[in-house]
Amino acid sequence: MKRIPMVIKLFSVLLILGIVSSAVTQIQKGKTRPLTTEQWMEGVIEPHCKSIKKGLEANLLEDKAWKKLAVNAAVLNESSYVLMADGRCPDGLWATAASETLRVGSTELLKAIESKNIEAAKSAFSQVTKSCSACHKAHKKKEK
Ligand code: HEC
């Protein structure tokens, strides 16, 4: 068997390291814009998700509260596009969680909110939160 020259071995190792580390940065940040995934989660997804949870727990909602919930649901829906933008998405699992589970769930949620149907809203919200766990299980590192 012919021996593989050292330069080629070294080059392969560097290439593999490069691919692995760029996949990691891709998850944490897009390719051109400064926003990190962590910032979007903390600044947008988590607060809107919490407001929906609180709002739906309150059950009997007034018009003003429904209107606020619609804002939250619409922002989560828009987030399903942000998470796919700027080359942030690393694989099919991410794509399914963002552009299917989160997007479809939040669209359903918005419909339920517009028709002020609390039961439908609760069930759509549970779809929305399935996207969090699906994506986190694969792509969010264990607690630091
Ligand atoms: C398509 C993937 C994806 C989806 C969907 C997703 N997340 Fe995340 N989330 C991540 C990744 C990746 C991180 C880790 C970011 C890092 O630490 O670099 C994260 C981190 C977080 C964090 C921790 C942020 C911090 O300050 O460290 C919170 C909170 C969070 N997500 C909430 C949610 C909630 C709530 C949902 C569902 C409504 C959700 N996420 C849906 C990918 C996703």
Indicate where each model-derived feature is located:
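The canonical Cys-X-X-Cys-His
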Residues: 128-139
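Extracytoplasmic c-type cytochrome modules immediately beyond a signal peptide or single-pass transmembrane anchor
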Residues: 24-127, 144
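Intrinsically disordered/low-complexity terminal segments and short unstructured peptides
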Residues: 5, 21-24
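Positively charged n-region of N-terminal signal peptides that target proteins for export
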Residues: 1-9
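Bacterial N-terminal signal peptides
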Residues: 9-19
